[in-house]
């Protein structure tokens, strides 16, 4: 983002331009990532309103939930959504919730609910990007249920991790530099895709989003890691 001062636009922070990679070894990198993520989660746990957690069962949201449960030292309230038939993702979210001892809520959506909400979601997103729309349907309906049926008003999410660490976007990148350029592009364009989805779906339901993986200190460090350490060398997607 930018702000206007002294007759010109000033960029708030350039998180993706790296002039020199850090020289930390793998053990140090892993240790630093862990500590910075914990710090990023911790600083976002202070809330005047009741706090909830979106839990998909994937690595990103699971880490945020697990760290939060440890830091707070009490049960956290997690929420997952899936179709009313064959909702495989709910299984993994339930396993994580059980493991960390969370107070877990499952929101089931029907095919008709998705169809009935489609036009509304497209309108609030302001985009016809198919992937963004598809990924937004569940989040919107989950946030709607949270707002209508609970007192939760602040939500922690696992967004931005995929763009930082590669996910499928950088699988089989031809070189470390190609990995870095793709990661830079993905982070620079966050406002057009994943962050757009989370921001619109959450705020449209009068909820506040908090994104620990977007912590400035965390992002700056991850982007400075030698991309050779992040390239997929396991020949698996």
Predicted region positions:
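N-terminal segments that mediate ammonia production and transfer
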Residues: 1-27
